[in-house]
Every structure is written in C-alpha cells, then in structure tokens.
C-alpha cells in the first residue's frame, strides 16, 4: 500500500519555526495569510521574537520605574511597523493648546492621562484609543493660571508634587482631590522629587531641602529634615527607594556639574562626568544615570565607577534640554533649537538613530522644554504649543534624516 505524502502544512511546529526563521518580513506576512495555523506559528514564534527588543516599541520587560504608557496595546506585528515609522521618521503631526504669550509647560504621560501645566494651573487631559487620541477639554484641573508658574512636577502613585516660580509648591492627592500648599524656597523652585515620605526641592540660587511628608487631617505637611547649601537645576531620587539623589548644576566653572548626594548624611560626591551644566537627568537603573548637558551631549554615567560609560553628541552642536527614557534601550533628547528631538539607542554608542522636527515655519526656533513618549506617540512642549507626533500613520510622508546623520558619523 502506497504511503501518503506528507504535506508542508502537516509539519510539526518546531520544523515550521526553523524553516520560517530563514524568511524575511515580507515573506512572513504572506505566509501568515495562508492559513490560521501558519498565522499562529509566525505570530507566537517569529513576530514576537522580532519585536521584543525594538527601540521604543519593544515588548521586553522594562525597568520597574518606567511603566508602560501605551494607550493602545499593539500586537507583535504592529510593533514592528511602528518601529519602522520611528526609524524612518514617518508620522502625522498635530498642534494643541496654542498660546501667543511665550511660556513653557511641563508634561507627564500615563496610559490614560496627559498631565500638563499651563502657567500656574495643572490640567489633566484624557487619552483615548480613538483617532483624536487626546481630549482637548481637561477632565479636571489643579490651581489657576493666574498663580505663579509651575516649574517642575512629579507624580508617583496618586500623589503629585510640584514647585512654582515664587518659591511655593503643592502636594495634591488625586484620589481624595486634596490640595496642600507648601513653602519650599525663598526664590524660584527649579526641580522637585519625592519617594514615599521623602520629598526634595531645590531652588535656583538658594539650597536643596529634604522634607518628611506628614498627613494631618487629610492635608500634607512637609517638615524640613535636612538642608544642603548647593542649589541645582535638576534632581532625581534613585529608584532603589530614594537612598541617593542625583543632582545637576545649572553652571559650574570647574566642569563638575553632576553630583551624587547621600540622602541620610547629606554628603555630596562629584561624579567624573565633565560638564559645565546639566539641564536634565534620569536614572536608567539603580546604578546608572542619563544626563542632558549644556555641552551638546547626552551621557550615561555609572555611579559605581563615577565615570562616563558612553557619550552621544548632537550632530548640530545644540544643548540637550530634556530627556525621556523608554525603560529599555531608547532615549529621546529634546534639543535647544527648532523644537528638534533626537532618538538614541543605548546599544549603539555615538550614533543618533533619527531626528524629528516640524517643517512648519511658525515658532520654529523654540527649544523643547519637556517631552514624553509611548510606542506610537511623541509629545513635544515648545514655548507656544504642544506638538504631538503620531507614528501610527503608515501612509504619512517620511522625514528621514539618516543620510545626513550617517555622513556626520562616518
């Protein structure tokens, strides 16, 4: 009796995965449409592997202090397409909250909400999975525009801590909707942060204060715990419970602008990362810090060796005003001019992956004062509006600057 011939579709799953692994992405897309079994095998074993470690869109485990911000949960194949859009500058641009008076806002991004300061008022806008992706009318607000400008704000859990230009600040409980005004400094508050009951604030020319947060009759009261004489432009508590404070000075003639402060003792250590000014910094993990500097560089600093581990320079010699980290490999840098944003890959030292800036001619000299991103959207604060670049737009015109970047690096 003649044996039945084995069909290709009858092969076991491991054999199919091995064969499919030799195909390019276009061929995989065609095969995934052949039958449901091929679609499942390719999605689970191939698309998931190809999309795991992609820049900005990868689904690998992220740092614990960098939770997912995606308003839409994309499948593995869609993540690959989104990465290609980031890589080749393919996006649709929208403008929100335009204002004639020059001032800059701060933003914080979550899965469901965008928090944005408008002078002295904090507005909370709902994000949706619909085409608009952002509701212009705020769902709720904190404070009033006529109050002193909000210079910096931080949200952890359901608590917001913010500092104002007149030296005051506030702690706001989002769950109970309770506002507690605080007096933090005698001059402009440049940055704040908190971790649990520990609150930190720093002024433009005064000092850095460590506070203990107490709740009395439902209101927050900050009790001064420690004061350090130095003032800083940017501060951030370490993600290991806030045992250390990374701090960057606005100006230091000795090029020792980056410091590490022991929270318990107030002892300051100078990190060997030569820079006259650090405008913004973030903790990558409990041992490494990302810094945006006046000297046109973004640096990765290891606190264990107190040395720079890697340095990325801007191709056009612009200072780095602000940073956003995706929790894995991607770092976005907001630059000093033309509301330009650079994308860097921590796995590729020196190399700028892509640049994003608007071709529109209005207010095109503004720095990027604050930025935030998820897998499909980039929020950019200029001095006259909020720009949103939506990368979930496959048919948008590509604005690819990699040719110029390759020429600069090589």
Predicted regions and their residues:
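Intrinsically disordered, low-complexity acidic/Ser/Thr/Pro-rich linker and tail segments
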Residues: 2-9, 13-21, 25-151, 158, ...
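Structural hallmark of WD40 beta-propellers
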Residues: 28, 111-115, 157-161, 196-200, ...
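Canonical WD40 repeat/beta-propeller blade segments in eukaryotic WD-repeat proteins
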Residues: 101-106, 145-153, 186-193, 229-237, ...
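Conserved strand-to-loop turn within each blade of WD40 beta-propeller repeats
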Residues: 118, 163-165, 202-205, 248-254, ...
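Per-blade loop-tip surfaces of WD-repeat and WD-like beta-propellers in eukaryotic adaptors/scaffolds
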Residues: 126-136, 168-181, 207-229, 238-244, ...
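Conserved blade-ending motifs and adjacent loop-strand segments that build the rim/top face
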Residues: 313-319, 350-372, 409
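Loop/turn-rich, solvent-exposed surfaces of beta-rich toroidal or solenoidal domains
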Residues: 318-347
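Blade-level signature of beta-propeller repeat domains, shared across WD40, Kelch, NHL, RCC1
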Residues: 370-410
């Amino acid at each position: 009796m003649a044996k039945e011939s084995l069909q290709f579709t009858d092969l076991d799953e491991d054999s199919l995965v091995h064969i499919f692994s030799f195909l390019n992405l276009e061929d995989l897309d065609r095969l995934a449409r052949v039958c449901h079994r091929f679609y499942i095998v390719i999605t689970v074993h191939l698309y998931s592997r190809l999309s795991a470690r992609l820049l900005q869109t990868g689904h690998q485990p992220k740092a614990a202090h960098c939770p997912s911000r995606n308003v839409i949960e994309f499948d593995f194949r869609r993540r690959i397409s989104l990465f290609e859009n980031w890589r080749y500058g393919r996006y649709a641009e929208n403008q929100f909250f335009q204002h004639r008076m020059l001032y800059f806002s701060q933003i914080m991004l979550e899965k469901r909400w965008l928090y944005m300061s408008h002078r002295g008022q904090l507005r909370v806008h709902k994000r949706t999975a619909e085409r608009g992706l952002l509701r212009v009318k705020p769902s709720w607000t904190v404070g009033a525009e006529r109050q002193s400008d909000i210079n910096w704000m931080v949200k952890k859990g359901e608590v917001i801590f913010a500092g104002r230009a007149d030296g005051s600040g506030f702690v706001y409980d989002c769950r109970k909707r309770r506002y507690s005004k605080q007096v933090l400094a005698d001059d402009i508050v440049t940055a704040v942060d908190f971790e649990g009951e520990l609150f930190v604030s720093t002024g433009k020319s005064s000092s850095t204060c460590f506070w203990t947060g107490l709740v009395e009759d439902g209101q927050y009261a900050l009790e001064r715990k420690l004061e350090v004489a130095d003032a800083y432009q940017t501060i951030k508590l370490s993600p290991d419970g806030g045992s250390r404070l990374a701090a960057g000075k606005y100006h230091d003639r000795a090029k020792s602008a980056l410091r590490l402060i022991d929270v318990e003792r107030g002892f300051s250590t100078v990190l060997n990362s030569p820079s006259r000014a650090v405008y913004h910094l973030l903790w990558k993990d409990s041992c490494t810090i990302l810094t945006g500097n006046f000297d046109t560089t973004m640096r990765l600093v290891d606190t264990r060796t107190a040395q720079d581990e890697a340095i990325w320079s801007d191709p056009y010699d612009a200072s780095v005003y602000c940073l956003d980290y995706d929790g894995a490999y991607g770092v976005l840098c907001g630059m000093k001019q033309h509301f330009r944003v650079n994308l860097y890959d921590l796995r590729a030292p020196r190399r700028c992956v892509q640049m994003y800036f608007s071709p529109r001619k209005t207010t095109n000299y503004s720095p990027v004062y604050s930025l935030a991103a998820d897998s499909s959207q980039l929020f950019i604060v200029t001095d006259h509006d909020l720009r949103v670049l939506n990368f979930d737009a496959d048919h948008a015109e590509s604005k690819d600057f990699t040719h110029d970047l390759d020429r600069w690096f090589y």
